[in-house]
């Protein structure tokens, strides 16, 4: 009879499983399954709790929560009741499936519960009120055993409530479970998360029979909280206690030795790993990868990687990320391709890393292909992957696409905003960058030092002192002004807005100074033509044991060039190589060509170019071309122009410079030929623009502008300035007009240059109490405007500051800070 009943139960179970599978295969929801069962007679009449329990256990084994729910529906339809044992199995099925709401409802409806019920709910982290759950268990009088305490300790940690774990320590001690290894390991982990290393050590000492899990837990506690040396001592004690290291302890030993910088010890750990064959474990393997990549030994890292199993995405992702961080973007791309060929599916970390590599290498094509893959594998909604995609398009100068992706984000974090702001700022779109910064503030985005640095960079590119001061005030208010990156950006902003004295005061108030701080200050002095001060700052920097880098010397060389300090510049260049072991880059050579060209040493400059160990860039030849034109050396000018056009046949600046050279020599036929070539090649001359800020608004002026609302006042001021300047001895330099026209027309043309229009507006609208007028210009100031500004500064008795594409010109009482060399 018993055998017969079991056969019936098996048959009924199969019928229910088949029915549930059909429901699930058809794509119906759990609710649909319940309705389907309710709409028909029960398919398994007469089953008892034991049979139901067996069926539910089978659902758990097959990871089939839908069938478990269908069985539950059938039980409810029949009005049957499960015993406590079977109900706990059903509760376990819901918990493991992640059906938290159903699990909690079932738990609350249970007519009786035992500690297994509470532990089951706790183990699945389905309860968001762990204290209430524990109190209920205690209130209902259920047994408190090691399993209960361990489950609740893990629940507290999983819900980021580890700080209340000590609350359980007292009853654990009271019941004598503090010496239990199972409970002790959970307590050690909880105290580790809280940062209470001493309490964890006390628990460890109280455990009578310490197993490998307890030892691994206390060692990990010390490592995770930064006690690397003590953790290594504990590892030694563990070995002396007779426990052989395993994957977990090897991983911990690697973390500790790397944290201490004991790389030789870490390599010794690697030797032990090789002896015990643990290298194939992904966790240990990643620890070794971290060791060798941190040492910069990508070769040994790659050897370790090749010994690891290739079916785990973690090692692939780690190596791709490290290649990108070390500047090996091509190698990262090759590795990603190998990963795809091995049929390993990338995760969000992999995609973010390879996209960062594309952004660094400006690989637009690959970035677009990866964009398609991101959408295909469903990571386009991941915020980190989306931010990396935006960064790729921004760095590849495709801001329209970057902004479109940004707008489509369902949720944005501060990195999303920063990426777009930085993208605009790097492209010289200061206005758009600052607008985005304002939008971020309106959206109550948490502004970081990156946000402030980018916003200040935008103010610097706009030369907007007013906006920069506002950002500075906000940085002070949010306690960001003292951060090194923000302070460095403040130095740069004030210097580029013409106030080098305030830039120096920001530097003087810095609590922490890094090499970028010195570089920002040196660059500021150099841009203002104060080469001697730049040299003095370099000496102070070296006296304070701060090692200068390539950017430091680039700023100093630029300052020497702007100030005409030929000998000092050459000595600085030689010292950079001789004393500091810094190999010159193209920018250093460009500064030296400008320096030598300014002193008329064109032969020496040409020899320097010919001796460069790599191919000279457009910038170097352009510096040589400009110097040759200033010295009226047509031979070198022609050669420089030819070299530039070999590299870039559509280089607009070269056509303009050569055209200006012919115009200066009144070779109008050659000028016409150059302009015809520009038209045929589709090369357009960048229009000269000057701008000035007044009351928060920026006013732009181009040559001969006539549509400004204050044009009548501007023209009146220009006529007055022309009259006063002529009486003061100003003589127009008609060679500055590179057009074939009569002298009268040339004189008129000179007085409608963009910087003079901006100056006239400033004199009309800015009160005389404002002693300084700052004008920005996108091109080099012409010789006639330079002469006129010197005279006008004496007439109006105000400081006139013009920042052109190369440097600042401070006009005061008829003298310019550049010494008439620019």
From Swiss-Prot:
It comes from the Eukaryota. GO terms for molecular function: RNA binding; zinc ion binding. Residues 696-726 are annotated as: Type E(+) motif. Residues 620-695 are annotated as: Type E motif. Its main location: mitochondrion. InterPro entries: DYW_dom (IPR032867), E_motif (IPR046848), Pentatricopeptide_rpt (IPR002885), PPR_At4g14850-like_plant (IPR046960), TPR-like_helical_dom_sf (IPR011990). This is Putative pentatricopeptide repeat-containing protein At5g13230, mitochondrial. The gene is PCMP-H89.
């Amino acid at each position: 009879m018993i055998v017969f009943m079991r056969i019936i139960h098996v048959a009924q179970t199969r019928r229910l499983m088949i029915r549930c599978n059909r429901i699930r295969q058809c794509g119906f929801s759990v609710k649909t399954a319940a309705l389907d069962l309710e709409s028909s007679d029960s398919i398994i009449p007469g089953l008892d709790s034991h049979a139901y329990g067996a069926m539910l256990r089978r659902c758990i084994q097959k990871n089939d929560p839908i069938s478990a729910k269908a069985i539950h529906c059938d039980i409810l339809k029949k009005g049957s009741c499960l015993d406590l044992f079977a109900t706990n199995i059903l509760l376990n099925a819901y918990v493991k499936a992640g059906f938290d709401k159903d699990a909690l409802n079932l738990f609350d409806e249970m007519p009786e519960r035992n500690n297994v019920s509470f532990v089951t709910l706790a183990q699945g982290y389905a309860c968001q009120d762990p204290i209430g759950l524990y109190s209920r268990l205690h209130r209902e009088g259920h047994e408190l055993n090691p399993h209960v305490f361990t489950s609740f300790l893990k629940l507290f940690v999983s819900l980021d409530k580890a700080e209340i774990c000590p609350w359980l320590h007292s009853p654990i001690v009271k019941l004598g479970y503090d010496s239990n290894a199972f409970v002790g390991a959970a307590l050690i982990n909880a105290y580790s998360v809280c940062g209470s290393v001493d309490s964890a050590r006390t628990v460890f000492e109280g455990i009578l029979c310490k197993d490998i899990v307890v030892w691994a837990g206390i060692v990990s506690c010390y490592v995770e909280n930064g006690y690397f040396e003590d953790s290594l001592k504990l590892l030694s004690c563990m070995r002396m206690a007779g426990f052989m290291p395993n994957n977990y302890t090897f991983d911990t030993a690697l973390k500790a030795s790397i944290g201490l910088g004991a790389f030789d010890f870490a390599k010794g750990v690697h030797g032990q790993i090789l002896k015990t064959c643990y290298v194939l474990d992904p966790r240990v393997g990643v620890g070794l990868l971290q060791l060798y990549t941190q040492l910069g030994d990508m070769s040994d890292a790659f050897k370790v990687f090749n010994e690891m199993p290739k079916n785990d995405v973690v090692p692939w992702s780690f190596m791709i990320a490290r290649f990108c961080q070390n500047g090996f973007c091509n190698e990262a791309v090759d590795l990603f391709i190998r990963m795809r060929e091995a049929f390993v599916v990338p995760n969000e970390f992999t995609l973010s890393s390879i996209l960062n590599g594309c952004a660094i290498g400006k690989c637009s094509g690959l970035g677009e292909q990866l964009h398609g893959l991101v959408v295909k594998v469903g990571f386009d909604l991941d915020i980190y992957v989306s931010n990396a995609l935006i960064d790729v398009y921004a760095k590849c100068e495709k801001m329209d696409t970057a902004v479109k992706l940004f707008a489509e984000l369902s949720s944005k974090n501060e990195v999303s905003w920063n990426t777009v702001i930085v993208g605009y700022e790097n492209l010289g779109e200061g206005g758009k960058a600052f607008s985005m910064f304002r939008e971020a503030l309106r959206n109550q985005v948490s502004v970081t030092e990156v946000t402030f640095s980018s916003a200040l960079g935008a103010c610097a590119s706009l030369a907007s002192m007013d906006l920069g001061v506002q950002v500075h005030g906000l940085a002070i208010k949010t306690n960001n002004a003292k951060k090194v990156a923000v302070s460095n950006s403040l130095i740069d902003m004030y210097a580029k807005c013409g106030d080098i004295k305030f830039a120096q005061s920001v530097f003087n108030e810095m609590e922490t100074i890094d090499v970028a701080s010195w570089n920002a200050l040196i660059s500021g002095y150099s841009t203002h033509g104060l080469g001697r001060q730049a040299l003095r700052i370099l000496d102070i920097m070296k006296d304070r044991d701060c090692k200068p880098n390539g950017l430091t010397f680039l700023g100093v060389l630029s300052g020497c060039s702007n100030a005409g300090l030929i000998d000092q510049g050459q000595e600085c260049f030689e010292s950079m190589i001789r004393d500091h072991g810094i190999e010159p880059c193209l920018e250093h050579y460009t500064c030296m060509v400008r320096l030598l060209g300014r002193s008329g040493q064109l032969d020496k400059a040409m020899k320097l170019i010919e001796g460069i160990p790599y191919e000279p860039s457009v910038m170097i030849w352009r510096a040589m071309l400009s110097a040759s034109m200033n010295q009226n050396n047509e031979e070198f000018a022609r050669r420089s122009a030819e070299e530039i056009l070999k590299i870039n046949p559509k280089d607009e600046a070269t056509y303009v410079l050569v055209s200006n050279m012919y115009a200066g020599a009144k070779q109008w036929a050659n000028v016409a030929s150059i302009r015809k070539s520009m038209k045929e090649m589709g090369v357009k001359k960048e229009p000269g623009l000057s701008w000035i800020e007044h009351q928060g608004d920026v006013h732009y002026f181009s040559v001969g502008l006539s549509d400004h609302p204050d044009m009548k006042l501007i023209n009146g001021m220009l006529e007055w300035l022309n009259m006063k300047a002529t009486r003061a001895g100003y003589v127009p330099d008609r060679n500055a007009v590179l057009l074939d026209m009569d002298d009268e027309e040339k004189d008129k043309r000179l007085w409608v240059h963009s910087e003079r229009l901006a100056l006239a507006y400033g004199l009309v609208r800015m009160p005389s109490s404002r002693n300084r007028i700052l004008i920005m210009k996108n091109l080099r100031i012409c010789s006639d405007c330079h002469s006129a500004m010197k005279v006008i500064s004496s007439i109006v008795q105000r400081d006139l500051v013009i920042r052109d594409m190369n440097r600042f010109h401070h006009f005061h009482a008829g003298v310019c800070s550049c010494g008439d060399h620019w």
